[in-house]
């Protein structure tokens, strides 16, 4: 009988510890009043409203520290569709290839962490050109507050022009694939929409989907 009671006590104690640990590691929740309703709003604009939410900012993990000397690619210029120059972190395929992966940054900007992710895709995929577009034109945030300001202040027309320019830079025969995280996840899907028939695949990591089904 005592053995049974000890076993039951141990099970209850274990369950309590697991429950406590679960609660301890939970991310902060967003109150219902802070949720932005944007079903009738342009998707490309809705994410900028999210950037004004403090709890939204708290959900972002600080970027990993990367040694720039270990990076494979270089910064290259290209022509954006608005007539102004753009730039991207670029790793060309080892042999000529019409496959292009467009990588879109998180809300921090085109930092070394995103460049490292681009490098990893290059290593994993092999015969592909990897192009991480600089959506903030050289600006990079180091804190959530500065990232919020960059994301809120980003010019929508400019970012569309950058993606259009990147697709054109890849060439009319290029097969376009895209990937991005959060801010970049939303833009990954927008890249596929902009690329049209050239788009062959798009991966969104916790990004906002397109609400306009006609697109």
Report residues per predicted region.
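Positively charged n-region of N-terminal signal peptides that target proteins for export
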Residues: 1-4
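Bacterial Sec-dependent signal peptides at the C-terminal "C-region" and cleavage site
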Residues: 14-26
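Serine-hydrolase catalytic machinery in alpha/beta-hydrolase-like enzymes
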Residues: 27-55, 61-69, 74-171
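Residue in the alpha/beta-hydrolase core beta-strand immediately N-terminal to the catalytic nucleophile
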Residues: 175-177, 200-203
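Gly/Ala-rich beta-loop-alpha elbow adjacent to hydrolase catalytic centers
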Residues: 180-184, 188
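The feature captures the conserved acid-bearing segment of alpha/beta-hydrolase catalytic domains
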Residues: 201-215
């Amino acid at each position: 009988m005592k053995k049974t009671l000890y076993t039951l006590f141990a099970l209850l104690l274990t369950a309590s510890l697991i429950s406590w640990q679960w609660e301890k590691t939970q991310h902060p929740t967003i109150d219902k009043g802070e949720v932005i309703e944007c079903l009738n709003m342009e998707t490309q604009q809705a994410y900028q409203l999210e950037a004004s939410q403090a709890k939204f900012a708290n959900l972002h993990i600080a970027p990993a520290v990367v040694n720039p000397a270990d990076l494979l690619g270089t910064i290259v210029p290209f022509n954006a569709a608005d007539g102004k120059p753009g730039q991207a972190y670029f790793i060309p395929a080892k042999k000529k290839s019409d496959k292009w992966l467009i990588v879109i940054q998180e809300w921090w900007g085109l930092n070394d962490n995103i460049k490292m992710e681009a490098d990893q895709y290059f290593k994993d995929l092999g015969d592909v050109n990897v192009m991480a577009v600089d959506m903030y034109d050289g600006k990079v945030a180091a804190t959530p507050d500065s990232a919020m300001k960059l994301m809120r202040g980003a010019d929508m027309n400019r970012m569309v022009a950058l993606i259009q320019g990147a697709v054109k830079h890849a060439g009319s025969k290029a097969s376009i694939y895209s990937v991005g995280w959060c801010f970049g996840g939303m833009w990954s899907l927008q890249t596929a929409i902009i690329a049209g028939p050239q788009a062959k695949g798009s991966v969104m990591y916790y990004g906002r989907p397109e609400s306009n089904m006609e697109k």
